[in-house]
Amino acid sequence: MKYADISLRLYMVFLRKYLESCGCEPDLIALIRLISRQMDPIRKAFLDNQMYEHTLNASGELQAQMDTWADEHLIKVVGESGLVRELASEEQADIIRFENSRCEYCMVMDPLDGSSLISTNLAVGTIVGIYENGGVLQPGSKLRAAFYTLFGPLTVLVVSVGKGVQSFAWDPESEHYLLLKDHFSVPEGKQYGTGGVRNEWLLPHLKVIEYFDQNGFKIRYSGSFVADCHQLLVYGGIYTYPGSEKSPNGKFRLLFEANPLGFIITQAGGRITDGRRNILNIVPEKHHQKTPVYIGSKGIIEKIEEIYKNL
């Protein structure tokens, strides 16, 4: 990232300064900055990790080499930091505890969301949620911070510490995250993306899609939850992966995907629901728990809940 007037850098807001202005504790700032700075080595590792492993993750999904690389890298860095007591990763069967931690923060993460798209060079990302009080089995409403990184033309960090949503772009020249957009507000867009298999959809979801089609919604779907959420953060609309006949609880993990992204979208004025309740209010029973997801513009979510209620 280069600027015609180098003095413009003096007026840029850096990630650290923003977090300080929000009154974040020094250890929380250190943790967010530590994790966010790992996105540069993760991005550089894409070139040498293009293939799939012959292994499955804890959710029974085929692992890409980058899933494993990013997961192991982040676990190592976080474990050595002394900033995290407990960590749950989508790629790990068990919760990891760091007994040497001097802090009581706990962390949930999807090290590389959308990794099946790596071979097609489409956008993928990393999702992170941070809680206080040393345990990961907390509702999303209790998140102290949540952020994701989107690896696209820019490496973009979207973060919320409970005071709105901001995005920062990684500047490889200065090796800092610079403020890209301040105070997102999810507009009431008319686009949607939906996962799943149509002939397995349940009646409420079929009615939801019928409503979209009858009201002129356009389909926008990439296959990466991070990328699709970022799109609706900018343009509005809805993204959904519903429950189905074969998988009534849907596909997305409550802790690693739904809660952090739902927290961010909610902080930007949107909402997240499973069709009947606010997902951020669900108390997790296990760390790989799944949930149906509808996430996006507030008005559209309210309409979806109305459709569910009337069936």
From Swiss-Prot:
Its main location: cytoplasm. Its cofactor is Mg(2+). GO terms for molecular function: fructose 1,6-bisphosphate 1-phosphatase activity; magnesium ion binding. InterPro entries: FBPase_C_dom (IPR044015), FBPase_class-1 (IPR000146), FBPase_N (IPR033391), FBPtase (IPR028343). Substrate binds at residues 113-116, 221, 251. Its EC number is 3.1.3.11. Mg(2+) 1 binds at residues 90, 110, 112. It catalyses: beta-D-fructose 1,6-bisphosphate + H2O = beta-D-fructose 6-phosphate + phosphate. It holds the Pfam family FBPase. One of its GO terms (cellular component) is cytoplasm. Mg(2+) 2 binds at residues 110, 113, 257. One of its GO terms (biological process) is gluconeogenesis. Pathway: Carbohydrate biosynthesis; gluconeogenesis. Belongs to the FBPase class 1 family. PANTHER family: FRUCTOSE-1,6-BISPHOSPHATASE-RELATED (PTHR11556), SEDOHEPTULOSE-1,7-BISPHOSPHATASE, CHLOROPLASTIC (PTHR11556:SF35). This is Fructose-1,6-bisphosphatase class 1. It comes from Methanospirillum hungatei JF-1 (strain ATCC 27890 / DSM 864 / NBRC 100397 / JF-1).
